Amino acid sequence: KSYNVGTVLFEDKASETKGSDIYHRIIPDAESYIKEQARTVLATLYNSPEDSITPVNKIHYTLEDIEGISAKGGGNGDVTIFYSTRHIEKSFAENDTAKLFFETRGVLLHELTHAYQLEPQGIGSYGTNRVFWAFIEGMADAVRVANGGFDGPNARPKGGNYMDGYRTAGYFFVWLRDNKDPEFL
């Protein structure tokens, strides 16, 4: 049995941009690609489709001509994720298709993790508690690390601690999985 990823709706809100054109060249079937990466995320976070999985009914994924990289919004089963065509253009500055594909997959793994991950309970929220924030962002980057979404050990920040969130926490969480508890993620 496979994981239920929900319905994926892809919408290009920046079709006139160079970033949109580049995206469509590297990802010709966005909805299928997003579903494939969602299954990767689910298989990383959960042991089986029978686990108690955060339900996602719909993912509305958009390309947008805005600043930033990507972000997940929504909730209660209806998720939105945007990906910036400006970031796509910057990532493609050297005309390196493989590098851009690698970055696009890594960003998608991170944002999809936010859609399906469990959240800490009883300690506040993303905006009010640093531990909550560090866990949420660290776990999203841990899924990216665990699935080869960064350039290996060289991408691991030196120093810092897990409360730094993102990549620092992500590499630490994967280390915990590999060295202390195979069920950590």
Q: Where in the sequence are the language-model features?
A:
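Auxiliary, metal-adjacent structural segments of Zn-dependent hydrolase domains
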Residues: 24-86
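Active-site recognition of the HExxH zinc-binding catalytic motif
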Residues: 106-119, 137-141
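Pan-zinc metallopeptidase signature
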Residues: 169-185
